[in-house]
């Protein structure tokens, strides 16, 4: 994902990259800067110095470098990205919907708030998730050695 492609990719929670992928913001090479969000989102996903180097040099990084910096969660063989992304999606979909939604919301919200603010923000999510039917179904299915039947309620 280069330039605008990376800016779109950075809006995603999870990224899967092929082993031969090049990832970068090359706009400075043509007299522009990455105005579609990469300068905001990239430093939130990789170390500051890596984001700065990518933005100022226009040089892309490899998929393995992106994984090492935490930008992508999985690197696959050249033609394996769709399959790996589907496996990741299926793995997420196997879990309780309310718990997944709360986890995602809290991880997204934690940036820029204090620890005290986070604990307050978490309280309504705890009330909703920990009192849900899914919170009962999870331990019951575990005890009964069966797959859970999530209701999302």
Regions found by a protein language model. Give the residues of each.
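A short acidic, helix-capping loop that chelates divalent metal ions and anchors anionic groups
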Residues: 27, 109-112
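Helix-loop "lid/cap" segments that line or gate small-molecule binding pockets
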Residues: 54-55, 106-110, 125-130
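Short beta-strand->loop
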Residues: 113-119
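Crotonase-fold acyl-CoA enzyme core
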Residues: 1-100, 131-132, 136-140, 146
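Intrinsically disordered, low-complexity regions enriched in Ser/Pro/Gly/Gln/His and often acidic
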Residues: 112, 142-143
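Short C-terminal tail/terminal secondary-structure segment
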Residues: 147-153
């Amino acid at each position: 994902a280069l330039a605008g492609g990376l800016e779109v990719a950075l809006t995603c929670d999870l990224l899967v990259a092929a082993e031969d992928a090049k990832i970068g913001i090359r706009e400075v090479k043509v007299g522009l800067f990455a105005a579609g969000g990469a300068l905001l989102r990239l430093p939130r996903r990789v170390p500051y110095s890596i984001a700065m180097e990518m933005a100022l040099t226009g040089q892309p990084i490899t998929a393995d470098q992106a994984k090492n910096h935490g930008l992508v969660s999985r690197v696959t063989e050249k033609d394996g990205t769709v399959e790996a992304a589907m496996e990741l999606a299926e793995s997420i979909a196997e879990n309780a919907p309310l718990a997944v939604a709360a986890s995602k919301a809290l991880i997204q919200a934690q940036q820029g708030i204090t620890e005290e603010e986070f604990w307050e923000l978490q309280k309504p999510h705890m009330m909703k998730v920990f009192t849900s039917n899914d919170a009962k179904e999870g331990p019951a299915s575990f005890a009964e050695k069966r797959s859970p039947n999530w209701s999302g309620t």
